[in-house]
């Protein structure tokens, strides 16, 4: 079970002021389970860990194994919730350094930006390698992944001719959309994105599960993590004992105290993309109607040598939540040297994991002393099962926190603003008039 520790934040919390936020969080949790809140049509994720079909899991595993056995590289194409969840788990659990091969392929991501050098070098990199594609898009028309798939499909056809289709798996809508139409015409293997699950809550659908399977990660253990924590946090009604409700209450309490930035920090570089996934989850869910906490992330101890100064002595507008796995790799022991030129012999006999843990504790003490409340999210280890628990904890907390704020945590209307302007500037049919207006504005500036 995930624990939320407040030992480095308790001095910033007044019980009498926190109480209304605890009550509001529990009320929001009940609203979530009543299926009567805003965005109720997108609650498919809530009970999904109990509803997954073994037949679908087996089919994903079989198709993934086929791609693994024919590919040195598998390119996962998607943006936002279509790639961040799987990338978070892959980056956290796969070795930092490995030599890819057929049967043990390298996983590369594309379609999450529009930078031309990246695509030019990716195409060149793939030209002499056996590769396959998992393209993920509900509609098939999202600009970034659509462009990526167009470019890589062209290369795939050039390399493999009529057999190219056997190297593409599409994760898309069950019955409609451009990608679904293309998949049917090319007879691609397909997996379905449920209509009642939004992108940022979709890591337990084929959106997240299939890329894990092609990477060789046990999706059954990942699913087990979701199932285990669901049974706990759905049943605990005391908001001080339910870590998800408590986290939601504390976040909104700190917001009311003028702390409108939350820093999700980690002391393990493998957790960096967990933070990236978390930023989308909370940013898109809460950042609307001029409300919400701004989600930021930092990688320690690296960022202590850049942003650490601001946290220690800058404007007191933030609080920290620190990802704290209980078990970390500790098999590297520091040995003494005869001359001790670096003056590090005092560390001899200690593992590097122990040194990193003392850095974590020292940082939390320093930041709390500097006026920054620091929460700790304690979970067992960095494994697929523990990450499953952590991700469901965040999804559940985010929905509760959004309802507590009075916003719909399942839509993202503001995302369309940049798309509309981009389409107009690119002369997309139907946007010509807006394009002229925007170009005039740009020229005046």
Curated annotation (Swiss-Prot):
GO biological process: gluconeogenesis; glucose 6-phosphate metabolic process; glycolytic process
Coiled coil region boundaries: none
Pathway: Carbohydrate biosynthesis; gluconeogenesis; Carbohydrate degradation; glycolysis; D-glyceraldehyde 3-phosphate and glycerone phosphate from D-glucose: step 2/4
GO cellular component entries: cytosol
Reactions listed under catalytic activity: alpha-D-glucose 6-phosphate = beta-D-fructose 6-phosphate
Record-linked PROSITE patterns: P_GLUCOSE_ISOMERASE_1, P_GLUCOSE_ISOMERASE_2, P_GLUCOSE_ISOMERASE_3
EC number, as in UniProt: 5.3.1.9
InterPro entries named in the record: BTB/POZ_dom, G6P_Isomerase, Phosphoglucose_isomerase_CS, SIS_dom_sf, SIS_PGI_1, SIS_PGI_2
Main location: cytoplasm
Protein localization: Cytoplasm
MF GO annotations: carbohydrate derivative binding; glucose-6-phosphate isomerase activity; monosaccharide binding
This protein's record includes keyword Isomerase: yes
Stored CDD domains: SIS_PGI_1, SIS_PGI_2
Active site per database record: 284 (proton donor), 305, 419
Keywords per UniProt: Cytoplasm, Gluconeogenesis, Glycolysis, Isomerase
Family per record: Belongs to the GPI family.
Function of the molecule: Catalyzes the reversible isomerization of glucose-6-phosphate to fructose-6-phosphate.
Family annotation (HAMAP family): G6P_isomerase
Descriptive protein name: Glucose-6-phosphate isomerase
């Amino acid at each position: 079970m995930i624990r939320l520790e407040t030992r480095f934040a308790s001095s910033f919390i007044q019980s009498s002021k926190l109480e209304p936020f605890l009550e509001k969080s529990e009320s929001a949790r009940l609203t979530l389970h009543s299926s009567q809140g805003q965005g109720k049509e997108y609650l498919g994720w809530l009970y999904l860990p109990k509803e997954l079909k073994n037949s679908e899991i087996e089919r994903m595993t079989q198709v993934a194994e086929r791609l693994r056995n024919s590919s040195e590289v598998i390119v996962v194409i998607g943006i936002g919730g279509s790639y961040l969840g799987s990338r978070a788990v892959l980056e956290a659990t796969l070795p930092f350094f490995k030599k890819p091969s057929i049967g043990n392929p390298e996983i590369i991501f594309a379609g999450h930006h529009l930078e031309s050098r990246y695509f030019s070098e990716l195409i060149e990199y793939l030209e002499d390698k056996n590769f396959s594609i998992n393209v993920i898009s509900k509609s098939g028309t999202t600009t970034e992944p659509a462009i990526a798939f167009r470019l890589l499909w062209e290369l795939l056809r050039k390399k493999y001719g009529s057999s190219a289709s056997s190297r593409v798996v599409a994760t898309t809508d069950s019955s409609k959309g451009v990608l679904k139409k293309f998949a049917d015409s090319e007879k691609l293997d397909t997996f379905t994105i449920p209509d009642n699950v939004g992108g940022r809550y979709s890591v337990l659908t084929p959106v997240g599960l299939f890329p894990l399977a092609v990477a060789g990660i046990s999706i059954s253990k990942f699913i087990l993590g979701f199932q285990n924590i669901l049974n706990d946090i759905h049943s605990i009604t005391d908001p001080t004992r339910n870590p998800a409700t408590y986290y939601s209450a504390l976040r909104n309490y700190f917001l009311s105290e003028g702390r409108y930035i939350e820093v999700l920090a980690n002391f393990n570089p493998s957790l960096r993309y967990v933070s990236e996934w978390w930023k989308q989850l909370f940013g898109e869910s809460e950042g609307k109607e001029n409300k919400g906490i701004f989600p930021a992330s930092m990688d320690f101890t690296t960022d202590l040598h850049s942003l650490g100064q601001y946290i220690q002595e800058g404007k007191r507008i933030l609080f920290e939540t620190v990802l704290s796995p209980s078990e970390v790799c500790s098999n590297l022991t520091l040995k003494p040297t005869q001359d001790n030129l670096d003056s590090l012999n005092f560390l001899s006999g200690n593992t590097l994991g122990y040194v990193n843990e003392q850095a974590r504790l020292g940082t939390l003490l320093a930041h709390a002393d500097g006026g920054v409340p620091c929460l700790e999210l304690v979970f067992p280890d960095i494994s697929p099962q523990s990450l499953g628990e952590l991700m469901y904890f965040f999804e559940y907390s985010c929905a509760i926190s959004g309802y507590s704020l009075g916003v719909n945590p399942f839509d993202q209307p503001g995302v369309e603003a940049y798309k509309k302007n981009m389409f107009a500037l690119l002369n997309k049919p139907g946007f010509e008039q807006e394009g002229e207006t925007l170009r005039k504005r740009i020229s005046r500036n």
